[in-house]
Amino acid sequence: MSLLVIGINHTSASVDLREKVAFSPEKLTKALDELKNSDAIQSGVILSTCNRTEIYCEVKHGISSGYVINWLAEFHHVALEILMPSIYIHEEQAAVKHLMRVSCGLDSLVLGEPQILGQVKKAFADAREHNAVEGTIEKLFQQDFSVAKRVRTETNIGGNAVSVAYAACTLARQIFESLSDSTVLLVGAGETIELVAKHLDDSGCKRLIVANRTRERAMGLAEQFNAEVISLPEIPEHLPKADIIISSTASPLPIIGKGMVESALKLRKHQPMLFVDIAVPRDIEGEVAELNDAYLYSVDDLQSIIDHNIEQRKIEAIQAEAIVSEESAEFMTWIRSRQAVNSIRQYRENSEAMRIELLQKSMQALASGQNPEKVLAELSNKLTNKLIHAPTLAMQQAAKNGETEKLTVIRTTIGLDN
């Protein structure tokens, strides 16, 4: 048996090719059934996300990566010559290390992103549900989850915001001690604002107001995060209630002006307000920054935070890579020890079968009245010849091929150099 990973990802393949070899839920069920019933694959897990498709498997003796690649191409009806240039292959410890790097976010488009671990866990759960995993692969994934947890615990690789949405929320958390006591006004209802809302919700934000041009789009967010919905013209009325304002619309002109904020601050008795403008062009007039107790950050300010945090993640990644190298080596040690146990068991079983076979023949000879001394002598000779046959052939072959090291190992193994 040997461990194998074959796959494509955002660095090796185009979006078009990644889409062609992605596994929908229906395709995944069929694929896992095929893996489970394959004569060549002992156990396997399929990881399929928007950025990667990878097959982690334990293949039987004599099976190469080409078998799995051919299967992938045939399954998705993609020509091999189109698929091959984008395929990467990892075997044995390299396969173990690759899985651990993936789960720790070290191989992600966004370094250190945590979502991939959940996707790996789901891929493993799907494979288990279809009885496609066992033995070494099952142990590998269980160990992988422990390694990912260790990396998150011992490093800060996921602790620095590297997306605009997350950076905006991080900034809010840094300025306001508790988001659970703050009111947040979100202006817009697009994908970025939806991500912001999710991060705020995860951070314990309880009071959320969503302002949008169309109420229908905002209602989806409101239902998801228990938010209040207002229209854009209603912003001046609700602005004094907001401690944090995060805006991202496609408006060609600013939505929130200096005068509007000035009025809100008076009604708030100049309690501080944080404005985070992540729209291009800007949603909030730059002059707002001139007001006391109004703190305005633009998308450029956030980008400088993100750039700094990316560098911090790269530093943390060095320690994470060291942990992965250590853990992958330890896992291979476990595999080798398991292989040794299996080899020892097989050797003992073969020897026992040989002993029983010769003993039965000797018992039959004794029962037929043959001389006991002669029977015992023949038994000992045959047993000796059978036991030394394989080592003798191996030493002869090693000597013939000039394999000095192999010859030394055999001599040590059979006790000649003890």
UniProtKB/Swiss-Prot annotation:
Gene3D superfamilies recorded: Glutamyl-tRNA reductase, N-terminal domain, NAD(P)-binding Rossmann-like Domain
What residues does the record give for site: Important for activity? 98
Q: What is this protein called?
A: Glutamyl-tRNA reductase
Which Pfam families does this chain map to? GlutR_dimer, GlutR_N, Shikimate_DH
The pathway to which it is assigned is: Porphyrin-containing compound metabolism; protoporphyrin-IX biosynthesis; 5-aminolevulinate from L-glutamyl-tRNA(Glu): step 1/2
Q: Which CDD domains match?
A: NAD_bind_Glutamyl_tRNA_reduct (cd05213)
Catalytic residues of the enzyme:
50 (nucleophile)
HAMAP family on file: Glu_tRNA_reductase
This enzyme's EC code(s): 1.2.1.70
Q: Which GO terms describe its molecular function?
A: glutamyl-tRNA reductase activity; NADP binding
Q: Which PANTHER family match?
A: GLUTAMYL-TRNA REDUCTASE
Q: What does this protein do?
A: Catalyzes the NADPH-dependent reduction of glutamyl-tRNA(Glu) to glutamate 1-semialdehyde (GSA).
What residues does NADP(+) bind to?
188-193
Q: What is stated about domains?
A: Possesses an unusual extended V-shaped dimeric structure with each monomer consisting of three distinct domains arranged along a curved 'spinal' alpha-helix. The N-terminal catalytic domain specifically recognizes the glutamate moiety of the substrate. The second domain is the NADPH-binding domain, and the third C-terminal domain is responsible for dimerization.
The family database entries (InterPro entries) matched by this protein are listed as:
4pyrrol_synth_GluRdtase, 4pyrrol_synth_GluRdtase_dimer, 4pyrrol_synth_GluRdtase_N, GluRdtase_CS, GluRdtase_dimer_dom_sf, GluRdtase_N_sf, NAD(P)-bd_dom_sf, Shikm_DH/Glu-tRNA_Rdtase
Other noteworthy facts: During catalysis, the active site Cys acts as a nucleophile attacking the alpha-carbonyl group of tRNA-bound glutamate with the formation of a thioester intermediate between enzyme and glutamate, and the concomitant release of tRNA(Glu). The thioester intermediate is finally reduced by direct hydride transfer from NADPH, to form the product GSA.
Q: Which UniProt keywords apply?
A: NADP, Oxidoreductase, Porphyrin biosynthesis
